[in-house]
From Swiss-Prot:
Protein name: N-acetyldiaminopimelate deacetylase
One Pfam family linked to the record: Peptidase_M20
Species annotation: Bacillus velezensis (strain DSM 23117 / BGSC 10A6 / LMG 26770 / FZB42)
Catalytic activity: N-acetyl-(2S,6S)-2,6-diaminopimelate + H2O = (2S,6S)-2,6-diaminopimelate + acetate
EC class (word): hydrolase
EC number, as in UniProt: 3.5.1.47
InterPro entries in UniProt: AcetylDAP_deacetylase, Amidohydrolase, Bact_exopeptidase_dim_dom, Peptidase_M20, Peptidase_M20_dimer
Length: 374
């Protein structure tokens, strides 16, 4: 697929961002392109708003897979680009439009240049939430099309085009959404002694939560608790009877995640006693760590370097969350960062990755699959 075609597809997809499990236009756009290929070369199955695509090998004995996430974010785009989002309040601010386009470029190559083994492509919805990887793994499709290896990438705005970065073992952290509700007795601002102020309770809790990191977490380990939103109260002269907190937890080990959650729940119990209120802690969405398979990852890095397909760098662990971790929990494989050189980072309303990165990615994966699927 020519570079100009990749860019045109990416811009089409960029115009129609949709959030998790609502990617109806996106799915249809992808199907319209995929259905143009000969039926003897590819097989297509849909799953909710996602798609499975099998590119048939000439004498298959195994199956290599590639996953591309397809959802967008609830962000009002501020790029001013001529192909900016046509859906107010939504934007491809995490590069999934490029991820999909790269997958299409790889598919196009192998439809026209068959290899021995089957290739499976997963267009996965809802990576940003509520999480599409884990339920997609339960699909009946993967009972008949079972990967022997699975791969994925994610754009990295901070890396130059022509660069990839990854490592064996832990790449991305365990992540969990955090929601806390505090319910007490409201009242008149002039009579605080007759009420239980949930704004004060929430404020106290937020500061206490940081002690879980500073005093309960091994200094040689890493963990993060971020409270991103607090809502409570209805007017300036009414003591709030309810407070709602939302945030995230990120850790580099499952053991740390269990410890952090246990301490959060203990601190909430303390708030219940101290402020005569009721507290509720929930974790709406939890993502397993991305843990690259040793051996396969080094082999991939060496292959890309030896064939000068990209500048290969060794990555550091990141506190980023990615539900591709569930796929790596089930199948061997790896994920890597793709340099996309943007002055604005992921989840930013002005993210504008360099489209030349797509050609690098297609060349890397075409080269890798051409060797290891033959």
């Amino acid at each position: 697929m020519e570079k100009e075609r990749l860019i045109a597809i990416r811009r089409d997809l960029h115009r129609i961002p949709e959030i998790g499990f609502q990617e109806y236009k996106t799915q249809q756009y992808l199907l319209n392109l995929l259905n143009q290929y000969p039926e003897e070369r590819i097989e297509i199955e849909t799953w909710r708003t996602g798609i499975f695509v099998k590119v048939n090998g000439t004498a298959p004995e195994k199956m290599l897979a590639y996953r591309a996430d397809i959802d967008a974010l609830s962000i009002e785009e501020q790029t001013g680009l001529p192909f900016a989002s046509e859906h107010p309040g939504f934007m491809h601010a995490c590069g999934h439009d490029m991820h999909m386009t790269i997958a299409l470029g790889i598919i196009d190559h192998f439809v026209h240049h068959p290899v021995k083994h089957d290739l499976l492509f997963l267009f996965q919805p809802a990576e940003e939430g509520p999480g599409g990887a884990e339920p997609m793994l339960e699909s009946d499709v993967l009972k008949k099309w079972t990967p022997d290896l699975i791969t994925a990438l994610h754009i990295a705005p901070e890396l130059p085009v022509g660069t990839i970065s990854t490592k064996s073992g832990l790449l991305f952290a365990n992540t969990s959404e955090l929601v806390i509700d505090l319910e007490g007795k409201g009242g008149h601002a002039a009579y605080p002694h007759t009420a239980d102020d949930m704004v004060v309770a929430a404020s106290t809790l937020v500061t206490q939560l940081q002690t879980v990191i500073s005093r309960n977490t091994d200094p040689l380990d890493s963990a993060v608790i971020t409270v991103g939103t607090i809502t409570g109260g209805t007017a300036q002269n009414i003591i709030a009877e309810h407070a709602h907190l939302e945030g995230t937890i990120r850790t580099l080990s499952e053991e740390s995640m269990r410890m952090v959650k246990k301490r959060i729940e203990e601190l909430v119990k303390g708030i219940e006693i101290g402020f005569r209120c009721k507290g509720k802690v929930t974790y709406p969405s939890v993502y397993h760590q991305v843990y690259n398979t040793s051996g396969l990852t080094e082999e991939f890095m060496q292959f890309v370097s030896d064939h000068q397909l990209a500048d290969v760098r060794t990555a550091k662990e990141a506190m980023t969350g990615e539900d591709f971790g569930y796929m790596l929990k089930k199948y061997p494989g790896f994920m890597f960062w793709l340099g996309a050189d943007s002055s604005h980072g992921l989840h930013h309303a002005k993210l504008n990755p360099d489209e030349d990165a797509m050609e690098t990615a297609v060349n890397v994966m075409v080269g890798y699959f051409s060797k290891y699927a033959n």
